[in-house]
Amino acid sequence: MPRSFLVKSKKAHSYHQPRSPGPDYSLRLENVPAPSRADSTSNAGGAKAEPRDRLSPESQLTEAPDRASASPDSCEGSVCERSSEFEDFWRPPSPSASPASEKSMCPSLDEAQPFPLPFKPYSWSGLAGSDLRHLVQSYRPCGALERGAGLGLFCEPAPEPGHPAALYGPKRAAGGAGAGAPGSCSAGAGATAGPGLGLYGDFGSAAAGLYERPTAAAGLLYPERGHGLHADKGAGVKVESELLCTRLLLGGGSYKCIKCSKVFSTPHGLEVHVRRSHSGTRPFACEMCGKTFGHAVSLEQHKAVHSQERSFDCKICGKSFKRSSTLSTHLLIHSDTRPYPCQYCGKRFHQKSDMKKHTFIHTGEKPHKCQVCGKAFSQSSNLITHSRKHTGFKPFGCDLCGKGFQRKVDLRRHRETQHGLK
C-alpha cells in the first residue's frame, strides 16, 4: 500500500478536536523548532499558550489530537499501551513502498535512521492497590538478625492478608510439609519455631545430632538432657541419680565428679571413673580369679598377673615385673621420690593411689563392700582377698608340694616353715 494513504490529512481530525494547550509532540517538520523545557514546564503547570494565527505556516501543519490528559506526569489510559494516533510511526517500511514522487510530507519518516518513539509515561495512579502489592513487597524487620549474626538467617516477605501463605504459611501454601509464620525469620528450608530452636534450624545433621541423639557418654556427662525437649529420645540414658557426675567449667574445660570432686581432663576419663568407682558397674570379669573390671583394657592388663612371664626387669636391682606400670612404681623406690604426703600423719608415698588408700585408715571410710556377706573394707585389695574365702580360689601354689594358698604372704610363710626356704 502506498505511504501516501497512511498519512492522515489535517481535515481528517483537525476540526474534530480542539487545539492542545500544551506543547505539540507530533510536529513532523524538521525545520520547526521543538518547544523548550521551560515552555513545556510552564504549559504543564496550567499556563495557556499564545493564540496562533490561522494564516501562519504552523496552522497548515497536521495537528495532533488533544493530549492534555497525556502529560508526562499522568497516564489515564492503558498502562504503556501503544496509541492509535501513532500507528504510522510504528508501521515498518514496506518492500513495495511508493516511489520517491509519492513520499510523505515528513522526510524523517523515509529515513532509515532510528528516531525516538513517543511512549506514554508509566502511571502509578492508574493501578489499583492490589496490582501494586506484587510489584513492591514489604519486608518486615528481623530482630533475630542481630541475635544470630553470622548464622545465615534471613527474613521472608510478609504475604497479603488474603494470600494462602498468610493462613497456612509459605511452605504449606506451595504444597510443602512445613509451615512458617508470615514475616518470620528462618535459617534455611527447615527452620523450626520457638526461641533458640530457629537459630539452629537447618545447619546439617551433625549439628542437630548433638542435641537430638545423645550417646551414652553424653548421657553420663549431661544428665539434665534427659528432661526437657528431648526427654522422649533419651530413654536409654540412665537416670540422674545413677549418673553421679556432671561437667564443671574450670578454666580449661575440665570435668568434675560430683560424688568425690575428682577432676578429669577428658569426658572419657570421667565416664570410666564413674563406672569403676561409683556406679558399681564392672562388666568385665577375669575367668581365672573372678575379679571384675570396668574397662576391657584393665582386664587385659590383669591377665598378665596369672602368667608366669615377667618381661619387665629393673636395671638397678634386677627385679622383674609382669607389667610396665609396676616397674615404673618400683623405680620410685630407688630414687626415693615420695611426692604424695598424707594430710593427717605426714607419711609420704610413691603413688597417689597408695596415699589415698592410707587416708582411709584415718577417716575410717570403708567404700569396698562384699556382695556376699556385706563386710566392708577400706582397700580394694583386702576385699579381693576376702572374696576368695567365698569362692575357694587359691591362686598361690607351692612349687615343692603343690599346696595352694589364697594370699601370697601365706605361701611365703609356708615355704619358710615347711621347707626351710627364705
UniProtKB/Swiss-Prot annotation:
Question: GO cellular component terms?
Answer: nuclear body; nuclear matrix; nucleus; transcription repressor complex
Sorted alphabetically, which InterPro entries does this protein's record hold? Znf_C2H2_sf, Znf_C2H2_type
Intracellular or extracellular location(s): Nucleus
Disorder cited: Neutropenia, severe congenital 2, autosomal dominant: A disorder of hematopoiesis characterized by maturation arrest of granulopoiesis at the level of promyelocytes with peripheral blood absolute neutrophil counts below 0.5 x 10(9)/l and early onset of severe bacterial infections. Dominant nonimmune chronic idiopathic neutropenia of adults: Relatively mild form of neutropenia diagnosed in adults, but predisposing to leukemia in a subset of patients.
Q: What is this protein called?
A: Zinc finger protein Gfi-1
The post-translation modification note in this UniProt entry reads: Ubiquitinated. Ubiquitination and degradation by the proteasome is inhibited by the ubiquitin ligase, ARIH2.
Q: What is the effect of changing residue 2 to A?
A: Abrogates transcriptional repression
Where is the segment annotated Disordered?
1-109
Swiss-Prot/TrEMBL domain comment: Zinc fingers 3, 4 and 5 are required for DNA-binding and for interaction with SPI1.
Keyword list, A-Z: Disease variant, DNA-binding, Metal-binding, Nucleus, Phosphoprotein, Repeat, Transcription, Transcription regulation, Ubl conjugation, Zinc, Zinc-finger
Phosphoserine, modified sites: 20, 56
Region ranges (SNAG domain): 1-20
**GO BP annotations, alphabetical order:** cellular response to lipopolysaccharide; DNA damage response; negative regulation of DNA-templated transcription; negative regulation of neuron projection development; negative regulation of NF-kappaB transcription factor activity; negative regulation of transcription by RNA polymerase II; negative regulation of vitamin D biosynthetic process; positive regulation of interleukin-6-mediated signaling pathway
Q: How does it assemble?
A: Interacts with U2AF1L4. Component of RCOR-GFI-KDM1A-HDAC complexes. Interacts directly with RCOR1, KDM1A and HDAC2. Also interacts with HDAC1. Interacts (via the zinc-finger domain) with ARIH2; the interaction prevents GFI1 ubiquitination and proteasomal degradation. Interacts with PIAS3; the interaction relieves the inhibitory effect of PIAS3 on STAT3-mediated transcriptional activity. Forms a complex with EHMT2 and HDAC1 to promote 'Lys-9' dimethylation of H3 (H3K9Me2) and repress expression of target genes. Interacts directly with EHMT2. Component of the GFI1-AJUBA-HDAC1 repressor complex.
Induction record:
Down-regulated by TGFB1.
- Source organism per UniProt: Homo sapiens (Human)
So what does this one do? Answer: Transcription repressor essential for hematopoiesis. Functions in a cell-context and development-specific manner. Binds to 5'-TAAATCAC[AT]GCA-3' in the promoter region of a large number of genes. Component of several complexes, including the EHMT2-GFI1-HDAC1, AJUBA-GFI1-HDAC1 and RCOR-GFI-KDM1A-HDAC complexes, that suppress, via histone deacetylase (HDAC) recruitment, a number of genes implicated in multilineage blood cell development. Regulates neutrophil differentiation, promotes proliferation of lymphoid cells, and is required for granulocyte development.
Which stretches are zinc fingers (C2H2-type)?
255-278, 284-306, 312-334, 340-362, 368-390, 396-419
GO molecular function per UniProt: DNA-binding transcription factor activity; DNA-binding transcription repressor activity, RNA polymerase II-specific; enzyme-substrate adaptor activity; RNA polymerase II cis-regulatory region sequence-specific DNA binding; sequence-specific double-stranded DNA binding; transcription cis-regulatory region binding; zinc ion binding
Location of region: Required for interaction with RELA:
140-257
